[in-house]
Amino acid sequence: MANLSYWLLALFVATWTDVGLCKKRPKPGGWNTGGSRYPGQGSPGGNRYPPQGGGTWGQPHGGGWGQPHGGGWGQPHGGGWGQPHGGGWGQGGGTHNQWNKPNKPKTSMKHMAGAAAAGAVVGGLGGYMLGSAMSRPMLHFGNDWEDRYYRENMNRYPNQVYYRPVDQYNNQNNFVHDCVNITIKQHTVTTTTKGENFTETDVKMMERVVEQMCVTQYQKESQAYYDGRRSSAVLFSSPPVILLISFLIFLIVG
């Protein structure tokens, strides 16, 4: 961790030093910078060629011969042949190279797949995420018939749970309660859409199965959350990082 911090400090110092040197370099001048304009354009107060605001002989508004408004021959308003209002051939007002416009950027399938693999928030579920697949636990329900029924039908029950980040809950019970409700609701709706219905026994067993998986999901997410906070605290409390932050503040303020 210390070596990484020193490398980060060296990288930022080199970067900001280069930026400071770039700011002090004089700006390169272009051709004819600060002088007169391109030959033939003239200065704002000088003469221009050809004269502005008028045309040649027989051109009251700057068009060619017989062109009262600046169009081609037989074009009263500046369009092409057969174009009364300035469009391209066969176009009533647009430009003539519509097909030369750049194509709209397409969404990369690689980006979409990457977002899905990263566990993005499930659309339409108000910020819920879908956990990774789990093995369904072996449960006992107090009698042989229910135990046998569970073993025969356990593959019909969820093996993934929906949940929100653990920092949105005060304790494990609230997390598990919310996790069980949304998971069973989503699973039953999806399965019913496929033409399969659940009995009261199925719902009872699903509640037990999903509860166990939600507890496991909470423990996993809590551990990851606290590990992340501890790592951040250790990183930002190390002397090299504190020195780096102080140096950046000095550069920004100064």
UniProtKB/Swiss-Prot annotation:
GO terms for molecular function: copper ion binding. Residues 52-95 have a biased composition (Gly residues). The gene is PRNP. It comes from the Eukaryota. The normal, monomeric form has a mainly alpha-helical structure. The disease-associated, protease-resistant form forms amyloid fibrils containing a cross-beta spine, formed by a steric zipper of superposed beta-strands. Disease mutations may favor intermolecular contacts via short beta strands, and may thereby trigger oligomerization. Contains an N-terminal region composed of octamer repeats. At low copper concentrations, the sidechains of His residues from three or four repeats contribute to the binding of a single copper ion. Alternatively, a copper ion can be bound by interaction with the sidechain and backbone amide nitrogen of a single His residue. The observed copper binding stoichiometry suggests that two repeat regions cooperate to stabilize the binding of a single copper ion. At higher copper concentrations, each octamer can bind one copper ion by interactions with the His sidechain and Gly backbone atoms. Cu(2+) 1 binds at residues 61-63. This is Major prion protein. Residues 90-231 are annotated as: PrP27-30 (protease resistant core). Keywords: Amyloid, Cell membrane, Copper, Disulfide bond, Glycoprotein, Golgi apparatus, GPI-anchor, Lipoprotein, Membrane, Metal-binding, Prion, Repeat, Signal, Zinc. Disulfide bonds join 179-214. InterPro entries: Prion, Prion/Doppel_b-ribbon_dom_sf, Prion/Doppel_prot_b-ribbon_dom, Prion_copper_b_octapeptide, Prion_N. Its main location: membrane. Residues 51-91 are annotated as: 5 X 8 AA tandem repeats of P-H-G-G-G-W-G-Q. It comes from Nothocricetulus migratorius. One of its GO terms (cellular component) is side of membrane. Monomer and homodimer. Has a tendency to aggregate into amyloid fibrils containing a cross-beta spine, formed by a steric zipper of superposed beta-strands. Soluble oligomers may represent an intermediate stage on the path to fibril formation. Copper binding may promote oligomerization. Interacts with GRB2, APP, ERI3/PRNPIP and SYN1. Mislocalized cytosolically exposed PrP interacts with MGRN1; this interaction alters MGRN1 subcellular location and causes lysosomal enlargement. Interacts with KIAA1191. Residues 232-254 form a propeptide. Glycans are attached at residues 181, 197. Belongs to the prion family.
